[in-house]
């Protein structure tokens, strides 16, 4: 028995000496790997719990999956270096789980990647099904090679090893790059990293050995028995003490700069890539320097919006004379003789019979300087939701008011749509408005300057009150039926007191729109149809799109491919840019799975989706009061959703917008509040500060616009 215990002690001392030699040479200890049994080692591994999070691994289940044991599985993965890299490595996988960050706080590559060529070749030589005798023979050869004087070599990091990893992820790249930056310079940080490297390797080797039942008692004795081992093992408990509290700090020190630098690099690469794709000069050459402007005709019912739009199309040559004459004959036969120009815009039979626009009509025309899309909004209060959808796609608003006696008053007074349309246009981001005083040729008006001033004075005060700047409001007298003041200036004989530009003259010469052609692609879906495939339509708010581009449909995150692009004239084109009204034939989603309010977006920078958000809200019209639990309808870009007030957080003082300390119990007309709102389903939204077109909304209840708001925070 004494001889047996003596032999046992000698064999243990020999193994300890081998481990010390391997640690000095930075080599992996095959003894620990030889007898690894996952089922047995799991419980010992579980005793060490720096952050109690290694249970997520399922007990080495993700490493070996209990197939082939430690040695065989890691051989299959290409040795220790490849196996640990493919699995995320001790450093990566443990850091990701938050459990072993303390090990790698000074040396992110975790020690194993130092072994590079020799150990990997030796490990790869141990093929599947190697016998114990072959392994013992190879082990003795390895020990003999360890006894040779070591040749000093330059330490290689993972990034310089020259080995290509098939499953290497971005995380491997981002962690290896800062390592090379840290270790290549000679200052203190690099020195400390290299100095702590042996300690980290020893710690990891000990844990690998402790994971086997055979090596477990040896490890315990190593840390307490011989003096030599104590000298080397004393730093390890220190590392242990450091590792328990450090993971969070280590993550802040190391992970944050890496992720920040990686995200900055990614953002820079994305911007550069998109700037390379589209050049401003290419766009100018493609369209002859003409930019695109969407204009919306809005105002009270019977103000003359459709007639004016139809006349503009005729005057610019977008509709030929024969077509107009045909409409004139048909209108005369139907007893609607004066409506024939509006029939150019109102193509629906019901619209023509009633003389009311129901849907947002769309038409296209072009001048010498610009390309235009007309959005003809319905003026009846029953169709305000359609008007909101149209206004969300417009760049410039043309507010048509009738100068005819009685009609102006009806439209402007309470219950008329003139005020509401102007407010909704402002809410939807139409910041420039042209007030067109129509029907100036009417017998009750006769181009009267007094009547013109009466109309514009009242309306001007209202427009300034809802937020329009003085420079963004333009007034002009026109006749939509005769065409006076539309393309050519008004005849001085009829109107000697007005010498300003005509409507098209002003539109052609106003400031150029600021387009984000090279921004991330974003297009809210305003309509859909099925025509040998799924077709969506809308206005491109940001970026550009080409045939064959892969995009994502939010909020359901469906990947789609653009098959065909149709421009405003229904012609196929290869590319479409920010500001244009387009139809896209797409593949990857069915028409039934789509609805207006979805957003087609770039996969690199998708739009955010939420069910709850914080917003600043101004209540403009409310019969009673609203409080927590109040529900109404929200119009957000092209989306229409029911929304509920979850919490009224603050009341804002008039003038200063100072927040109240106590939350208000209710809100009423004229108040500004900050509240948390919730929708039933996911909606695509951004904060107003980041993307104004996706961060402003309108609230309606019982057929009335009760509030406008902007999103301040996504929750």
UniProtKB/Swiss-Prot annotation:
<dbReference type="GO" id="GO:0003924">
    <property type="term" value="F:GTPase activity"/>
</dbReference>
<feature type="region of interest" description="Disordered">
    <location>
        <begin position="1"/>
        <end position="148"/>
    </location>
</feature>
<dbReference type="GO" id="GO:0003747">
    <property type="term" value="F:translation release factor activity"/>
</dbReference>
<dbReference type="InterPro" id="IPR009001">
    <property type="entry name" value="Transl_elong_EF1A/Init_IF2_C"/>
</dbReference>
<feature type="compositionally biased region" description="Basic and acidic residues">
    <location>
        <begin position="218"/>
        <end position="233"/>
    </location>
</feature>
<dbReference type="InterPro" id="IPR031157">
    <property type="entry name" value="G_TR_CS"/>
</dbReference>
<feature type="region of interest" description="G5">
    <location>
        <begin position="479"/>
        <end position="481"/>
    </location>
</feature>
<dbReference type="Pfam" id="PF00009">
    <property type="entry name" value="GTP_EFTU"/>
</dbReference>
<dbReference type="GO" id="GO:0005525">
    <property type="term" value="F:GTP binding"/>
</dbReference>
<feature type="region of interest" description="G4">
    <location>
        <begin position="438"/>
        <end position="441"/>
    </location>
</feature>
<feature type="region of interest" description="G1">
    <location>
        <begin position="299"/>
        <end position="306"/>
    </location>
</feature>
<feature type="binding site">
    <location>
        <begin position="376"/>
        <end position="380"/>
    </location>
    <ligand>
        <name>GTP</name>
    </ligand>
</feature>
<keyword id="KW-0342">GTP-binding</keyword>
<feature type="region of interest" description="G2">
    <location>
        <begin position="355"/>
        <end position="359"/>
    </location>
</feature>
<feature type="region of interest" description="Charged">
    <location>
        <begin position="129"/>
        <end position="285"/>
    </location>
</feature>
<feature type="compositionally biased region" description="Low complexity">
    <location>
        <begin position="13"/>
        <end position="25"/>
    </location>
</feature>
<dbReference type="Pfam" id="PF03144">
    <property type="entry name" value="GTP_EFTU_D2"/>
</dbReference>
<dbReference type="GO" id="GO:0000288">
    <property type="term" value="P:nuclear-transcribed mRNA catabolic process, deadenylation-dependent decay"/>
</dbReference>
<dbReference type="InterPro" id="IPR050100">
    <property type="entry name" value="TRAFAC_GTPase_members"/>
</dbReference>
<feature type="compositionally biased region" description="Basic and acidic residues">
    <location>
        <begin position="199"/>
        <end position="208"/>
    </location>
</feature>
<feature type="binding site">
    <location>
        <begin position="299"/>
        <end position="306"/>
    </location>
    <ligand>
        <name>GTP</name>
    </ligand>
</feature>
<dbReference type="InterPro" id="IPR004161">
    <property type="entry name" value="EFTu-like_2"/>
</dbReference>
<feature type="region of interest" description="G3">
    <location>
        <begin position="376"/>
        <end position="379"/>
    </location>
</feature>
<feature type="compositionally biased region" description="Polar residues">
    <location>
        <begin position="1"/>
        <end position="12"/>
    </location>
</feature>
<feature type="region of interest" description="Disordered">
    <location>
        <begin position="168"/>
        <end position="262"/>
    </location>
</feature>
<dbReference type="InterPro" id="IPR000795">
    <property type="entry name" value="T_Tr_GTP-bd_dom"/>
</dbReference>
<dbReference type="GO" id="GO:0005829">
    <property type="term" value="C:cytosol"/>
</dbReference>
<feature type="compositionally biased region" description="Low complexity">
    <location>
        <begin position="176"/>
        <end position="198"/>
    </location>
</feature>
<dbReference type="InterPro" id="IPR054696">
    <property type="entry name" value="GTP-eEF1A_C"/>
</dbReference>
<feature type="compositionally biased region" description="Low complexity">
    <location>
        <begin position="39"/>
        <end position="129"/>
    </location>
</feature>
<dbReference type="InterPro" id="IPR003285">
    <property type="entry name" value="Sup35"/>
</dbReference>
<keyword id="KW-0597">Phosphoprotein</keyword>
<protein>
    <recommendedName>
        <fullName>Eukaryotic peptide chain release factor GTP-binding subunit</fullName>
    </recommendedName>
</protein>
<dbReference type="InterPro" id="IPR027417">
    <property type="entry name" value="P-loop_NTPase"/>
</dbReference>
<comment type="function">
    <text>Involved in translation termination. Stimulates the activity of ERF1. Binds guanine nucleotides.</text>
</comment>
<keyword id="KW-0677">Repeat</keyword>
<dbReference type="GO" id="GO:0002184">
    <property type="term" value="P:cytoplasmic translational termination"/>
</dbReference>
<comment type="similarity">
    <text>Belongs to the TRAFAC class translation factor GTPase superfamily. Classic translation factor GTPase family. ERF3 subfamily.</text>
</comment>
<keyword id="KW-0963">Cytoplasm</keyword>
<dbReference type="GO" id="GO:0018444">
    <property type="term" value="C:translation release factor complex"/>
</dbReference>
<keyword id="KW-0547">Nucleotide-binding</keyword>
<feature type="compositionally biased region" description="Polar residues">
    <location>
        <begin position="26"/>
        <end position="37"/>
    </location>
</feature>
């Amino acid at each position: 028995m004494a001889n047996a215990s003596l032999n046992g002690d000698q064999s243990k001392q020999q193994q300890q000496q081998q481990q010390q030699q391997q640690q000095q040479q930075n080599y992996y200890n095959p003894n620990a790997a030889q007898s690894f049994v996952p089922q047995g080692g799991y419980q010992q591994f579980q005793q060490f719990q720096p952050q109690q999070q290694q249970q997520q691994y399922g007990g080495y289940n993700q490493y070996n999956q209990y197939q082939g044991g430690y040695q065989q599985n890691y051989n299959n993965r290409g040795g220790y270096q490849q196996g640990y890299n493919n699995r995320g490595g001790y450093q990566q996988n443990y850091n990701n789980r938050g459990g072993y960050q303390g090990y790698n706080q000074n040396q992110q590559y975790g020690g194993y990647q130092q072994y590079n060529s020799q150990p990997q070749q030796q490990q790869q030589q141990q093929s599947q099904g190697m016998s114990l005798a072959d392994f013992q023979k190879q082990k003795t050869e390895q020990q003999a090679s360890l006894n040779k004087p070591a040749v000093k070599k330059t330490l290689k990091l993972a990034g310089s090893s020259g080995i290509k990893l098939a499953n290497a992820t971005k995380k491997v790249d981002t962690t290896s790059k800062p390592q090379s930056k840290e270790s290549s310079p000679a200052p203190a940080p690099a020195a400390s990293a290299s100095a702590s490297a042996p300690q980290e390797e020893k710690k990891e080797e000990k844990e690998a050995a402790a994971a086997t039942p055979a090596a477990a008692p040896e490890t315990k004795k190593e840390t307490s028995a011989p003096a030599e081992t104590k000298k080397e093992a004393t730093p390890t408990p220190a590392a242990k003490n450091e590792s328990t509290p450090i993971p969070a700090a280590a993550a802040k020190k190391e992970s944050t700069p890496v992720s920040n630098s990686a995200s900055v690099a990614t953002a820079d690469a994305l911007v550069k890539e998109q700037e390379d794709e589209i050049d401003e000069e290419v766009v100018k050459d493609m369209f002859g320097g003409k930019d695109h402007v969407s204009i919306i005709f809005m105002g009270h019912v019977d103000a003359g919006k459709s007639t004016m739009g139809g006349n503009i199309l005729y005057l610019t040559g977008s509709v030929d004379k024969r077509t107009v004459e045909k409409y004139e004959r048909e209108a005369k036969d139907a007893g609607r003789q004066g409506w024939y120009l509006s029939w150019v815009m109102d193509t629906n039979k019901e619209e023509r019979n009633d003389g009311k626009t129901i849907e947002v009509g769309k038409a296209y025309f072009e001048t010498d300087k610009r390309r235009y899309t007309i959005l003809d909004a319905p003026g009846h209060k029953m169709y305000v939701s359609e008007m909101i959808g149209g206004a969300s796609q417009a760049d410039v608003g043309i507010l048509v008011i009738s100068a005819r006696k009685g009609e102006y008053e009806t439209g402007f007074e309470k219950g008329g749509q003139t005020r509401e349309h102007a407010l909704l246009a402002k809410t939807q981001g139409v910041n420039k408005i042209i007030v067109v005083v129509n029907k100036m040729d009417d017998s009750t008006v006769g181009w009267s300057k007094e009547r013109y001033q009466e109309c514009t004075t009242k309306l001007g005060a209202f427009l300034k009150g809802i937020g329009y700047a003085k420079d963004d409001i333009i007034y002009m007298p026109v006749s939509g039926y005769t065409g006076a003041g539309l393309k050519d200036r008004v005849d001085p004989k009829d109107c000697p007191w007005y010498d300003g530009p005509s409507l098209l003259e002003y539109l052609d010469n106003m400031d150029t729109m600021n387009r984000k052609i090279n921004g991330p692609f974003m297009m809210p879906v305003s309509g859909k149809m099925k025509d040998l495939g799924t077709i969506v339509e809308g206005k491109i708010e940001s970026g550009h799109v080409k045939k064959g581009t892969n995009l994502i449909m939010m909020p359901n995150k469906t990947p789609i491919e653009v098959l065909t692009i149709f421009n405003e004239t229904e012609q196929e084109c290869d590319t479409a840019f920010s500001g244009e009204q387009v139809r896209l034939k797409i593949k990857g989603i069915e028409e039934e799975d789509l609805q207006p309010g979805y957003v087609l977006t770039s996969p690199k920078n998708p739009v955010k989706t939420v069910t709850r958000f914080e917003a600043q809200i101004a209540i403009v019209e409310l019969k009673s009061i609203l409080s927590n639990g109040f529900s109404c309808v929200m119009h957000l870009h092209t989306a229409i959703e029911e929304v509920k007030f979850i919490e009224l957080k603050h009341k804002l003082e008039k003038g200063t917008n100072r927040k109240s300390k106590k939350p208000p119990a209710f809100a009423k007309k004229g108040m500004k509040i900050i509240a948390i709102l919730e929708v039933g389903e996911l909606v695509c939204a951004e904060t107003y500060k980041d993307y104004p077109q996706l961060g402003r909304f309108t609230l309606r209840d019982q057929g009335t616009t009760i509030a406008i708001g902007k999103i301040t925070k996504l929750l």
